[in-house]
């Protein structure tokens, strides 16, 4: 029911955004000049840029929605700014600068976003503990919310995993949303193979709210994803706890969206709390419960 409501709101916003942008493109001088007194032609000319933006939907519906929303929001802000300037100066602009500014800002903003999304940066955090972990330093790598296919495809992810392997990680933890409804089977298989890297303690995976898929439109099943992960040496944790080499624990929680999910009290039953405890929980909504249970480190998406 919730997803029907969300989809309905997105549909309403999408239709509203298209209508708003049509009225804005119609304000450009070249549209008025070409259309003359032909009102129908003016609307048709204003619709051409919308159709051009719509071609992005053939590559990704997600991309189309992102472009549409950003353009509509930036245009609304630019129109508001132009209105304020007009009130202050008491002069009408001879050209539709607000529209040109909205297009330029959207193009620059989304280009920067695309660049940052496709260029992965290494972020490092240093955490200290008084607990014995069997080594002077342990290198933990976390990969979350890849949403395979949105920014990185299978080959792109494989290149990033090679970078990670070169760092000589001790353990790799993937706290969910490795794939989603837009991911393709060939990319999924390549990405799972790329996870088969040399580590000290292995690669561990928990499910997020997107991994199992909300719809039936992708070309692989949740079971096929699980099969490929296991085939490549990945340990999947579903409300489970493992003692790694008798040194530290990794607890993998079911996602909060699941109907049945064990409490931290249940997951901590029988655990030696003198050992270091890592919890992987996709959604960062239960930190208080996890902190009270005695977890030392919680990794979320």
Please annotate each region the language model reported.
Residues 1-118:
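Non-catalytic terminal accessory segments
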Residues 53-64, 91-93, 131-135, 244-247, ...:
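Generic structural signal for short, solvent-exposed loop/turn connectors between secondary structure elements
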Residues 135-301:
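Soluble catalytic domains of enzymes that build or remodel membrane lipids, polysaccharides, and related
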């Amino acid at each position: 029911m919730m997803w029907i409501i969300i989809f309905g709101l997105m549909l309403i916003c999408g239709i509203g955004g298209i209508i708003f942008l049509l009225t804005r493109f119609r304000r450009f001088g070249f549209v008025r000049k070409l259309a003359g007194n032909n009102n129908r032609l003016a609307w048709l000319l204003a619709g051409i840029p919308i159709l051009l933006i719509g071609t992005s939907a053939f590559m990704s519906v997600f991309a189309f929605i992102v472009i549409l929303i950003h353009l509509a929001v930036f245009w609304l802000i630019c129109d508001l700014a132009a209105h304020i300037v007009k009130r202050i100066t008491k002069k009408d602009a001879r050209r539709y600068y607000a529209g040109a500014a909205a297009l330029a800002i959207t193009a620059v903003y989304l280009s920067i976003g695309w660049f940052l999304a496709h260029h992965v940066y290494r972020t490092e955090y240093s955490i200290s503990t008084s607990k014995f972990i069997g080594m002077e330093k342990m290198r933990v790598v976390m990969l979350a919310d890849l949403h395979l296919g949105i920014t990185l495809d299978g080959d792109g992810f494989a290149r990033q995993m090679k970078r990670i392997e070169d760092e000589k990680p001790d353990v790799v933890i993937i706290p969910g949303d490795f794939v989603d409804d837009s991911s393709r089977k060939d990319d999924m298989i390549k990405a799972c193979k790329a996870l088969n890297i040399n580590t000290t303690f292995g690669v561990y995976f928990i499910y997020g709210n997107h991994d199992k898929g909300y719809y039936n439109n992708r070309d692989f099943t949740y079971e096929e994803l699980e099969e490929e992960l296991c085939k490549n040496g990945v340990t999947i944790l579903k409300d489970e706890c493992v003692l790694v080499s008798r040194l530290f624990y990794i607890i993998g929680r079911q996602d909060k969206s699941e109907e049945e999910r064990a409490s931290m009290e249940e997951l901590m039953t029988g655990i030696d709390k003198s050992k270091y405890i890592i919890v992987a929980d996709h959604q960062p909504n239960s930190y208080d419960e996890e902190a009270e249970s005695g977890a030392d480190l919680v990794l979320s998406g």
